């Protein structure tokens, strides 16, 4: 394997596919059924298809990609999806004009023409507990690039674009590219953790753990916010209006919800967090 710090002369196009997947969770406490309904409507409006399109357009700009096509959709009763096809090379004027047109998505024959290209997608999932006041908003984001451009450049921007309490990230490199001598290269950059690409303020704000499979070029990082300021988690209510015992109970419910999402399992009813 060549040193990743030095540039390798490739035979043809860089065929490596680099994919970065996010699951971002925003947790909130809305006491009444009316407040929970209002929260879901609020979050659905804040992260509608138009706003998500702007976020993903910024991501394309950050990683140095060219936009080929945009498809977006708001769903009823809630949720939104946006898909952007991107390429590494500059696009023609005709393709650039087509990218400005918002439509239901490319037809199958159009997709076949871009199988060697890259994409950015986002889907949102607002939901709430049926009995308690905890509500959770989830955004799933995938940034997949083919060539030298790296989705890792957009890491910090995406984390800061959402009110992220828990973040689950997967980064993988697939395929191979050849150098001029015909030797295969299965990765073209140094990495031992996704955390290498996190800003210092992000590392300080979150508790993080890694599960990496280096020989498979597969990297997994989970993050959960360290500090819980109750005022920032109440919807339609102020912490100052609550009794101390009620504040403690709400904080317990919020921390439990975050811990279960972070661990990926339900805790026992009497298990402390």
From Swiss-Prot:
It catalyses: S-adenosyl-L-methionine + H(+) = S-adenosyl 3-(methylsulfanyl)propylamine + CO2. GO terms for molecular function: adenosylmethionine decarboxylase activity. InterPro entries: AdoMetDC_fam_prok, S-AdoMet_deCO2ase_bac, S-AdoMet_deCO2ase_core. Pathway: Amine and polyamine biosynthesis; S-adenosylmethioninamine biosynthesis; S-adenosylmethioninamine from S-adenosyl-L-methionine: step 1/1. The record marks 117-118 as: Cleavage (non-hydrolytic). Its cofactor is pyruvate. Is synthesized initially as an inactive proenzyme. Formation of the active enzyme involves a self-maturation process in which the active site pyruvoyl group is generated from an internal serine residue via an autocatalytic post-translational modification. Two non-identical subunits are generated from the proenzyme in this reaction, and the pyruvate is formed at the N-terminus of the alpha chain, which is derived from the carboxyl end of the proenzyme. Keywords: Autocatalytic cleavage, Decarboxylase, Lyase, Polyamine biosynthesis, Pyruvate, S-adenosyl-L-methionine, Schiff base, Spermidine biosynthesis, Zymogen. It comes from the Bacteria. The keyword S-adenosyl-L-methionine applies. It is an enzyme of class 4 (lyase). The active site is at 118 (schiff-base intermediate with substrate), 123 (proton acceptor), 146 (proton donor). One of its GO terms (cellular component) is cytosol. Pfam families: AdoMet_dc (PF02675). GO terms for biological process: spermidine biosynthetic process. The keyword Ribonucleoprotein does not apply. Its EC number is 4.1.1.50. The modification Pyruvic acid (Ser) is found at residue 118. Binds 1 pyruvoyl group covalently per subunit. Heterooctamer of four alpha and four beta chains arranged as a tetramer of alpha/beta heterodimers. Belongs to the prokaryotic AdoMetDC family. Type 2 subfamily. Catalyzes the decarboxylation of S-adenosylmethionine to S-adenosylmethioninamine (dcAdoMet), the propylamine donor required for the synthesis of the polyamines spermine and spermidine from the diamine putrescine. This is S-adenosylmethionine decarboxylase proenzyme. It comes from Alkalilimnicola ehrlichii (strain ATCC BAA-1101 / DSM 17681 / MLHE-1). The gene is speD.
